[in-house]
Amino acid sequence: MGQYVLLNGIVLTARDKVHKYLFSKRPDAGAMPFSLEGGVIYHCGPIIRQSPEGARVIAAGPTTSARMQMYEPFIIEHYNVRGIMGKGGMSGAVANAMKESGCVYFHAIGGAGALLAQRIKKVSGVWLLEEFGPAEAMWAFEVEDFPAVVTIDSQGNSMHRQIEDLSRQRLEEILISG
């Protein structure tokens, strides 16, 4: 926990609508163009520019992960996901699912969507574009040296929870001594 990492390989975007779809429809691996098994899901609604040469990512900053946490334990366990990336952390229930499945949470840099887009070398494909539109579709990105920090480790330890606990403790100390 707290390790700075550079991700390389395929990252799949998924926001609210894709999470709800995966949870409610439960498509099997054969029904999806991408495999989630062993993969990384990025909570991101990218800005994509289409051209005759293909899709190019203009911005790809993280979105708040808490909105997806009601679906995430199921998705981690059912699809055997090994990494979730976003911003803001996730609940204790998600951290427990991560512990059970050997998954981690990567915190990406909020407010740096254009900078992060430079680490996306190729758009490999898209799923559910017609149904959900470009921001909510699932995109497959080939990333190179994509920066993030591990803030929930595969043992379920959460840096977010530790900071909350420490902040609460310090606030109590200030209020009592004040």
Where do the PLM segments sit?
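Feature captures the catalytic cores and cofactor-binding loops of soluble hydro-lyases/lyases
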Residues: 13-146
